[in-house]
């Protein structure tokens, strides 16, 4: 096993798009889980806003302009339920999508693709992420890792000689459980919208409140989190050396990133109760 560093933010949509395009978030533009698009929050995994599905209103191909897999037609072995999603169009377009209904199908579908002469096959399994969110790191998580190890073993048995298998995670996770901090009402009153997720939040301030909001966030939460302005983050290259104008526009003005195993939520929009969470920069 080799320890690697994922992208910022360490979240599924951002990391998977970097895997399939070879580009950092600042270039591909999927800069987080919930992204501000015209003062509405796009859930980048579900490609929905508060109005429901928006695949016809927010074009995935325009939103994420980098061609996946450098334009090669690659078989993608992934859960069947994702085959026609907006996010799939954004980060897997042009691929030959081979959906599986059960994880046990993966080895055979991969083997069939290789036997047809494909030089690269891409596969995705989301079970460990789900278990981590629901149960956290521990016995359930370890049991799921054992399940993955079995699947990997089955894949290895089907591969012809001189075929390599690379297994990687898209991000890590920490146990948060009930360590949840409700964002102060005075902060919310100075904020137009909050994008991102509970361990990497972007604040989009109301006009004239940016400086005061930065100070107050530091005063309230610096014990638990990093507070950075957008310019600091861009100058330090968190999203890569090149950040497109399109990606830059989607960022808020101030970022709040959990340093401790905590989550930040809005009282009126707490989201699902999760034990394991990701999104920040911690190991």
Feature-to-residue mapping (PLM):
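Feature captures the catalytic ectodomains and active-site-proximal regions of enzymes
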Residues: 1-283
């Amino acid at each position: 096993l080799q320890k690697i560093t994922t992208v910022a933010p360490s979240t599924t949509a951002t990391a998977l798009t970097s895997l399939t395009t070879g580009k950092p978030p600042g270039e591909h533009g999927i800069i987080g889980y919930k992204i501000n698009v015209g003062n509405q929050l796009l859930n980048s995994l579900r490609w929905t806003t508060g109005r429901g599905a928006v695949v016809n209103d927010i074009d995935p191909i325009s939103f994420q302009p980098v061609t996946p897999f450098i334009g090669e037609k690659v078989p993608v072995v992934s859960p069947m339920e994702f085959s026609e999603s907006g996010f799939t169009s954004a980060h897997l377009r042009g691929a030959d999508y081979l959906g599986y209904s059960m994880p046990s199908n993966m080895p055979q579908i991969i083997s069939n693709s290789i036997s047809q002469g494909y030089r690269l096959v891409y596969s995705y399994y989301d079970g460990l992420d789900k278990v981590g969110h629901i149960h956290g790191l521990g016995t359930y998580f370890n049991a799921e890792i054992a399940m993955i190890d079995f699947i990997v073993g089955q894949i290895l048995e089907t591969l012809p000689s001189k075929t390599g298998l690379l297994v990687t995670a898209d991000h890590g996770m920490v146990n948060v459980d009930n360590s949840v901090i409700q964002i102060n009402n005075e902060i919310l009153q100075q904020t137009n919208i909050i994008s991102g997720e509970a361990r990497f939040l972007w604040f989009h301030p109301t006009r004239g409140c940016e400086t005061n909001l930065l100070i107050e966030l530091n005063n309230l939460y610096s014990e638990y989190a990093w507070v950075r302005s957008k310019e600091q983050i861009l100058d330090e290259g968190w999203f890569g050396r090149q950040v497109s104008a399109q990606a830059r526009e989607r960022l808020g003005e101030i970022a709040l990133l959990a340093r401790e195993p905590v989550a930040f939520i809005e009282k009126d929009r707490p989201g699902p109760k999760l034990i394991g969470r990701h999104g920040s920069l911690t190991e």
